[in-house]
Amino acid sequence: MDNNNAFQLSFDEQHYAWLAIDVPGEKMNTLQAAFAEEMQAVFATLNEKRGQIKGLIIHSLKPDNFIAGADVRMLEACQSVHEAQALASQGQQMFQQLADLPFPVVAAIHGPCLGGGLELALACDYRVCTEDEVTRLGLPEVMLGLLPGSGGTQRLPRLIGLLPALDLILTGKQLRAKKAKKLGVVDACVPHSVLLDVAKRLLEEKGHKKRAQVTLPIKEKLLANTDLGRKLIFDQAAKKTQQKTRGNYPAAQAILEVIQYGLEKGMHAGLEYEAKRFAELVMTRESKALRSIFFATTEMKKDLGADAKPAPVAAVGVLGGGLMGAGISHVTVAKAKTSVRIKDVANDGVLNALNYNYKLFDKQRQRKILTKAQLQAQMSQLSGGTGFVGFDRCDVVIEAVFEDLKLKQQMVADIEANAKPTTIFATNTSSLPIHQIASQAQRPQNIVGLHYFSPVEKMPLVEVIPHATTSDETIATVVTLARKQGKTPIVVKDCAGFYVNRILAPYMNEAAQVLMAGEPIEKLDAALLDFGFPVGPITLLDEVGVDIGAKIMPILVKELGPRFQGPDVFDVLLKDNRKGRKSGKGFYTYKGSKKKEVDKSVYKLLKLTPESKLNDKEIAMRCLLPMLNEAVRCLDEGIIRSARDGDMGAIFGIGFPPFLGGPFRYMDTLGLTKVVEMMNQHTEKYGERFAPCDGLLTRAGLGEKFYP
């Protein structure tokens, strides 16, 4: 067969067929519509030799991936539901031909087996995967606002049962090998070195027979195979899905309907309905926005932030053993696979960071992600003390001490005195300008901002902030390190609040204005949850800490002007020791594991009588418009380099609703004329803080958009 083909068919002396997948010129195997002709030739050969073939083994020639999924770029070419449906039907037909082969087929999986890759594997009789860390199996289409469109919604429930299949498809979660084996997604997980041998042996052990129908557990039969049981499962799933998505993600409801339809009407009807609903989702605004995030994150993986080669990083130092320092040390060891030396003024601080790491690793051990030996190996990469021992080996030192300019300047001096001349000093400040921190440095070219978000091990964004004389190599090195830590880095200009806090502040200020106008706290939070944010603004303030807000806001007012001046609530709250969750009370009460409730006494403290006057949409738009306005200012001032970076920063930094694609894509969707119109209406009603900025007015006047 042509070596330029993605699918290469061969036969061994024992009459086994081997189908190797290797997409030419690509690092990852993806499925493309253009391969249909190749696959038809493969099926023709297999059917022609059907009487001689004992079985077929499908495997990848890529060193670290099976099939990462269908090529999402194909969907961008679809101009109609009809075209998208034809694409899904083509994939279904190809996998059905695989399932209909007269001899058994086994998929030998190493590395990611996702989306269309897993759907291909599900069409096989058997599946064997490696137990390597790189091996992951899942159907993540829901993350793109889609459903599995090549048979996944029909085959997975029939293989592993309805309940576990719903969990996998609705969440898009990826399974490690052992979990996949436990659920029955794969028949065996083995060392990589014997993968192909075991796959072939499995066919021999099965007597070269097609797989019989899977026998599901009694509980699954009672629940999923009876009308009453199915109704109960789907009703509960719909209720939970609505609570989680608040109706903002149509793919979740479509997944439930397609799976239910297939179980009730049969496989053939289920596949037809799957293709239809898949196609409808492809054309939705939500899926287009979610796909734009996928493309942006893929592009950003190639972006080093500067035109320079990153320096190698073999060891990292962390200054400060508090929550941020502990989190930074964790992602450096766990994700970046780099050793860390922690320094704190007190031994207790170092012990706190080590204990924090141990607890996170031990959770992984309890979930059988790590063995005890692997946990110990991870912890051996962490060390610390109250002095600078070991800092002479650090290539990067990340500072996570208190937000105090003189203290941070002292940290710069200490590292310049105790580390290599080439050591990069990265400051995790959330509000102080980087050029001020670097103002007394001997080597200012090595200093850069690296703003993480809390909790570090969960929040995906990091802002990289060079000052005027930061070297390109420094930028490229910390961008690369951040990416290895599992983060999405965006390079932003050195200015008060940087990007994320600068667009968050007007949003939070307006939420406070709405609150001080008498809107009930729970109504205000619920309105933004319904709009699509992961938490409401008042809950967010409680989680971040009222004291943190009280520190950041005056800096923004001083540096950027009176539009950042919010209602004076911080002092009143702090005098009553209301810092939020950390002090046990804020706007909500926090008592043990009991569900948080609004602390009604806060109304009296703020001299308010709660009364709902606005509807949810009015509340949401009041809070959102100042954020949109500030995002445009940031773009025009060069704080962010592109609308893409602004959208990614908002989504990954503050949880801007992903299904809207970010503030800039959302404004494009609304139309800039409409955005300006809404801002003018709010200006008349609430004041000059809503006045649209020049950049918005100009673009709206010219009929421009942020994206082509």
From Swiss-Prot:
EC number: 4.2.1.17, 5.1.2.3, 1.1.1.35
Catalytic activity, as annotated: a (3S)-3-hydroxyacyl-CoA = a (2E)-enoyl-CoA + H2O; a 4-saturated-(3S)-3-hydroxyacyl-CoA = a (3E)-enoyl-CoA + H2O; a (3S)-3-hydroxyacyl-CoA + NAD(+) = a 3-oxoacyl-CoA + NADH + H(+); (3S)-3-hydroxybutanoyl-CoA = (3R)-3-hydroxybutanoyl-CoA
Keywords (A to Z) from UniProt: Cytoplasm, Fatty acid metabolism, Isomerase, Lipid degradation, Lipid metabolism, Lyase, Multifunctional enzyme, NAD, Oxidoreductase
Gene3D superfamilies referenced in this protein's UniProt entry, alphabetically: 1.10.1040.50, 2-enoyl-CoA Hydratase, Chain A, domain 1 (3.90.226.10), NAD(P)-binding Rossmann-like Domain (3.40.50.720)
One GO MF term: NAD+ binding
InterPro entries, per the entry: 3-OHacyl-CoA_DH_CS (IPR006180), 3-OHacyl-CoA_DH_NAD-bd (IPR006176), 3HC_DH_C (IPR006108), 6-PGluconate_DH-like_C_sf (IPR008927), ClpP/crotonase-like_dom_sf (IPR029045), Enoyl-CoA_hyd/isom_CS (IPR018376), Enoyl-CoA_hydra/iso (IPR001753), FA_oxidation_alpha_subunit (IPR050136)
Keyword Glycoprotein recorded: no
Metabolic or biological pathway: Lipid metabolism; fatty acid beta-oxidation
Gene Ontology CC terms: cytoplasm
Primary localization: cytoplasm
Localization of this protein: Cytoplasm
Residue ranges of the region described as 3-hydroxyacyl-CoA dehydrogenase: 311-708
Annotated GO biological process: fatty acid beta-oxidation
The keyword Magnesium is annotated on this UniProt entry: no
Assembly mode: Heterotetramer of two alpha chains (FadJ) and two beta chains (FadI).
Role summary: Catalyzes the formation of a hydroxyacyl-CoA by addition of water on enoyl-CoA. Also exhibits 3-hydroxyacyl-CoA epimerase and 3-hydroxyacyl-CoA dehydrogenase activities.
Family note: In the N-terminal section; belongs to the enoyl-CoA hydratase/isomerase family.
Protein name (database record): Fatty acid oxidation complex subunit alpha
